[in-house]
Amino acid sequence: ENSLENKNYNLTRKILKNFKEEDEIYYWYKLKKMYQIIYNEEGTDQALNYIEAKFNKYTNPSIKILYDMANIYQNSKKFDESIKYYSKILQKINKNSETYADVLYKRGSSYERLGDNENSDKDLLKSLSIKPNDPYVLNYLGYGWLERGYKIKDAIDMLDKAYNQRQNDPFIIDSVGWGYFLIGDYVNAEIFLRKAIQLMPGDPIINDHYGDVLWKLNRKMQAKYYWQSSFNSKETEEELKKKIKIKLLKGLDKV
């Protein structure tokens, strides 16, 4: 682990050679670490080609391996593929278990990224019926509803419930702040979004949100600073960059 974190990939490869194919758990661990090395050295496509070729050799992969592959596809923005494997897992596990709720959450988030709000809501609400206080599902669903302008009061209630459990989670704090922004309470929005950006200063979405609320509070030079930070981030998706570019040139009201 340390050699991988320190980017000493040659040492990591030497260590991983000791993991034999006969031991499925440790061998799969080796394959995942090799996937990470290839991802860091050569990029997403080459890493996916590697792990897919290895995964396809398994005739009866364990639930753990299926879950890892589903997550790899989700992190690679191959959401259709991730849904396929999350669905396979759901067919194999107890429908009342916390694990079932967790996988529903993951599948629901993939549906949401595809714009399939109907199936996303269905999975997330089902997950909450099993684990009604899960702060991350409450946050994800509440934030999604706010973005869609759907059931605003219920969405804010969910975010408050999540925040009461995770008061130092920057993503949950950002969601609460954004909720205040969307209902026009810019003073409270600024308080929460400022706290979120202090905890996660490099996150492009939090920077963008904080820029928006500063603009509404007529702190326009500061707003442009945070928009620019978001625009410059390597993690910022192209669609968001397009919106930020307009904001930097013409202001928030033109988006």
Language model features: what each stretch is:
Residues E1, Y35-Q36, N71, S109, ...:
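Residue-level recognition of tetratricopeptide repeat
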Residues E5, N40, N75, K106, ...:
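Register position in tetratricopeptide repeats
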Residues E24-I25, T59-N60, N94, E98, ...:
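Short coil turns that delineate tetratricopeptide repeat
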Residues Y26-K30, I65, T99, V103, ...:
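TPR alpha-solenoid repeat register
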Residues K33, D68, K106, Y140, ...:
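Canonical tetratricopeptide repeat
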Residues H209, K216-V255:
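Terminal, low-structured helical/coil segments at or just beyond the last alpha-helical repeat
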